[in-house]
Regions:
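The conserved phosphate-sensing helix
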Residues: 204-222
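A short, basic N-terminal segment
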Residues: 1-45
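Conserved small helical "lid"/interfacial subdomain of P-loop NTPases
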Residues: 156-197
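Short, amphipathic alpha-helical interaction segments positioned at domain boundaries
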Residues: 334-352
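Walker A/P-loop nucleotide-binding motif
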Residues: 44-63
Length: 352
């Protein structure tokens, strides 16, 4: 039996979402097969692109392929980054092997460094005739950035974080990190309410749902003594704990009253029209959300609405962008989190 004390002691490992702990690899059989085939057939100067949302396991997949010797790159190699390749192109000369791995081609990097890094990569490939694997978010689908790389192909198979995938990963994590605490007939529902698992992996969110988002939320609740006390009671995570935690969360990075006003309107709308997220099939456009703001008598102009209200909500992990980040030539801005938007798990659980 896993106690609260046991779970708190092991929460960083069981719910890890970074390279701090070496978690076992799970699933992604289709991704592995396609990636192995495409990597093996890469010709000099060609690039394999992996374009998926942040925190979904792209780098983890590549590291797994390297550790299994399915990619000809030495283990524990430090991957290049878009920023690093932009600022110091000579780093590419130092990367071991004939396949460069360039990571973090995503919204954490400025657009100028993204395009600069990819242009430098293409120039290097032209001269060296080496190959490359480029790892990034949907920024890689931006036409201007995409055009920086000439001979490219995209990894099309990348298993999404649906309910079955999440259950499999969680069960494996408990068995790997806490084997001495498990009963012989252990099942995941012994520790986590099935309804909570369902809530953390809605079908309509699987294209943008991330391990980082799910596991960081699980860590936060388990680490809080208010919801999981450091005692020998049987550990059991219920959806009510997460609802209360998010209702009490004071970490929202909102600094304008109008942002809170719209958040309240949005919460009521989701609660009444999409209880527990049921009925959501796609993201909301700026027009749809602005219409909701008008119905709620929110004082904001359409031209300011996205920048002043929607973007801060996305940064605060209340809305999740499903669009393609792009550079607005007229405004000179990198639009990192464009519409359509779907409610985040954080937002959904707060209106449960």
């Amino acid at each position: 039996m896993i106690t609260n004390k046991d779970l708190k002691r092991c929460s960083q490992q069981v719910f890890t979402y970074s390279a701090q702990y070496q978690a076992p690899f799970y699933g992604r059989e289709k991704s592995i097969i396609e990636m192995q085939d495409k990597t093996a057939s890469l010709k000099p100067g060609e690039v394999l692109m992996i374009s998926q949302p942040l925190g979904t396991g792209k780098t983890f997949l590549v590291n797994h392929m390297i550790s299994e010797e399915k990619i000809n790159v030495p283990r524990n190699s430090n991957f290049l980054t878009a920023k690093g390749v932009d600022e110091n192109p000579d780093l590419m000369n130092q990367f071991p092997g004939d396949i460069l791995i360039v990571d973090e081609v995503d919204i954490k990097t400025t657009y100028k460094k993204l395009t600069g890094g990819m242009s430098n990569l293409q120039e290097y490939l032209n001269k060296s005739e080496k190959k490359a694997i480029v790892i990034g978010d949907f920024s890689l689908k931006d036409p201007k950035l995409n055009d920086c790389l000439h001979n490219q192909q995209m990894l099309t198979e990348f298993e999404q974080l649906d309910r079955e995938f999440l259950r499999g990963v969680l069960k494996q994590r408990f068995e790997y990190f806490m084997p001495n605490y498990l009963d012989v007939d252990f099942c995941l529902e012994d520790v986590i309410d099935a309804e909570l698992i369902n809530y953390l992996s809605p079908e309509w969110m699987k294209t943008v749902n991330s391990f980082r988002g799910v596991f960081s939320l699980l860590q936060s609740v388990v680490n809080s003594d208010k919801y999981v006390r450091f005692n020998n009671d049987k550990a059991y995570l219920e959806i009510s704990m997460f609802k209360e935690y998010l209702a009490d969360d004071d970490s929202l990075d909102l600094d304008e009253e109008v942002q809170y006003e719209f958040l309240n309107v949005l919460r009521e709308y989701l609660r009444s029209e999409f209880p527990k997220g049921a009925g959501i099939t796609s993201g909301f456009t700026v027009d749809e959300l602005y219409q909701l703001a008008q119905m709620g008598e929110i004082d904001t102009e359409y031209d300011d609405f996205a920048d002043e209200i929607l973007y801060p909500l996305a940064v605060s992990d209340l809305l999740v962008s499903t669009g393609i980040p792009t550079y607005d030539e007229d405004d000179g801005q990198f639009i990192r989190r464009p519409a359509p938007f779907v409610p985040s798990l954080k937002l959904l659980l707060s209106v449960y």
